[in-house]
Amino acid sequence: MSDSTPASPAPTPSSDPNLLRILFLGDIVGEPGRKGVSVVLPMLKDELKVDFAIVNGENSAGGRGITPKIAISLMRCGAAVITTGDHIWDQKEIVSFMKDEPRLLRPINYPEGTPGYGSIVLETAKGKVGVINLQGRVFMAQQLENPFPVIKAAVEEMRKETPIIFIDFHAEATSEKVAMGWHLDGQVSAIVGTHTHVPTADERVLPKGTAYQSDAGMCGPIDSVIGSQIEPVLERFHTMRPARFGVGSGAVRINGALITVDPSTGRALSIERITRHWHD
């Protein structure tokens, strides 16, 4: 007589406790974004059983850069690493802070001798996780070193220590981001873009096991122009004259991505867009 007891379902990426879950939140914009992240990030870590959280703090200080105080507050609410981009130097006091805080990253393809760190490896209960911050060049005012050879060398070096590698590629052009995804497929666990503040619907795991998304979006005010107040932006488009952009206000959208990784190989098993709403 056969055993009629149904077989236990195979573990899925969302249920297997042995897999590593990395949460990444896109560009945090100003005080509204910071407040939203301070509330939502701890909730997401609990809800999604996150092992390692990364946030982009590029625009967290009034839309331009990040301060030491803000960096510390983001770490206290659950960010293991903070990535940045072209606005990293906007707040002058951050330079001395970065020298002693390796968890706050700036793009790795700045010239040799630039203050701060472009990458870091941290220990977790499920193995070491490496994070690299990279900046693109297409349509970007800052022309840093070519990101393609720079990241290749950085990844090769980091893989000596861990196969679990996450890359925040801060870039404007989607084509440059997509090309970088193919450039790194099979060599890193995930590459997720930032900078445009608009989440893309192209998340996927590439053929060789790298999770990819062109842009994670932003953590900032919904009723805005990619985080900025609407009226000054409209004025600039109408008059073609300079206008000061403040950060928008009101309800906040939290955008990001959840990547599930096999810690033994570093291969991504899934990537999922994350969206939450918060209002003060």
Feature roles, as predicted:
Residues 2-280:
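Acidic, metal/ion-coordinating pockets
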